[in-house]
From Swiss-Prot:
Keywords: Membrane, Mitochondrion, Mitochondrion inner membrane, Repeat, Transmembrane, Transmembrane helix, Transport. One of its GO terms (biological process) is erythrocyte differentiation. Pfam families: Mito_carr. It is found in: Mitochondrion inner membrane. It comes from Mus musculus. Solcar repeats lie at residues 45-134, 141-225, 237-321. Gene3D superfamilies: Mitochondrial carrier domain. One of its GO terms (molecular function) is glycine transmembrane transporter activity. The chain crosses the membrane at residues 51-76, 109-135, 147-172, 200-223, 241-267, 296-314. This is Mitochondrial glycine transporter. Its main location: mitochondrion. Belongs to the mitochondrial carrier (TC 2.A.29) family. SLC25A38 subfamily. The lineage of its organism: Eukaryota, Metazoa, Chordata, Craniata, Vertebrata.
Amino acid sequence: MGVSAEPRSLSVAGAGLASPVIEKARSALLQSQDVEDTVETLMLHPVIKAFLCGSISGTCSTLLFQPLDLLKTRLQALQPSDLGPRRVGMLAVFLKVVRTESLLGLWKGMSPSIVRCVPGVGIYFGTLYSSKQYFLRGHPPTALESVILGMGSRSVAGVCMSPITVIKTRYESGTYSYESIYAALRSIYCSEGHRGLFRGLTATLLRDAPFSGLYLMFYSQTRTAVLHGTAQLDAALIPLINFSCGIFAGVLASLVTQPADVIKTHMQLSPVKFQWIGQAATLIFKNHGLRGFFHGSVPRALRRTLMAAMAWTVYEEMMARMGLKS
C-alpha cells in the first residue's frame, strides 16, 4: 500500500509540473494553427488581393499624373471665344493655371480623382482577374479575348464610379465650385436628378471600354512577344519591359478613343447644351471642326499612357510578390 501510494503521488506531482509546459505547447500550437488558418483564408481570396494591388497602383499613378488630367479638361472646356485667332496649347493652359491658381492648382480635383481611381482601378483589376480565372482557366488570352475582357472589366468599373467621374470633371473645369464631394453629389441630385449623376455615362463607356480593351490587347500581345523572344532575361528588367509595353499600348489606345473623351467632357460640363451624343458631336464639329475632337489629346495621351503603364507595372510586381499570376 505504501509503495503503491508513493508513485501515485509522484505521478500526480509530475502531472502538476508538466501541465504548464503542456498548456504552453498547446497554446503555441493553437497560435501556429491560427496563423496557418489566416494565411489559408487569405489564399482563398485572390480576387481581393487583385483588388488591393489595383487600388494601390491606382493611387500611385493618380497622385503623379493628376495635373495632366486637369490640363486635358481645361483644354476641352475652352470655348471658341477663348481660343481667338491663335491656337491655345497645353503649355499656355499650364502657365495660366500656375499664374492664377498657384502650382497646387494643377492638383485641383484630386479628392474626387482619388475617390474614383482608387476603388475604380481596384474594381477593374479585381473583375479582370476573376474573369480570367473563370473563363480562361489559366491559359493566356488571345487578342480578341483580351479586348473582350478589358472592355467588360472597364464597363463594370465605369458604371460603379460614374457619379464620382461627373464630380471630378466639374471640379477640374474650374466652372463649378463645391464644398465637398458629398455637397457635390447632393447638389447634382437636387438640380438634375439621378440622371445627372450618370451624365455622359454612354460617352464614358464608349471611351473607357474600347481603351481598356485595346490597351489590354496591345499590352498582353506585346509583352508576350517580348518575353518569349528572349531565352534568358534578367528579372530586374521585367518591370522596365512591362512599363515599355504599357507606353506603347497606351499611345495607340488613347488616339483611337480621343473623340469619345471630348464628347464625354462636354456632356458633363454643359448638360443642358449637350444632351445626347449625336447632338454633342454635331455641335463640337460645328464650333471647332474636326480638330475639336482632338482637343486635349496631348495631355490625355501622356496621362493615360503613363498612368496605365505605371498601374500595370505596379500591379504586375505586387501580384508576383503575392504569388499570384496576373
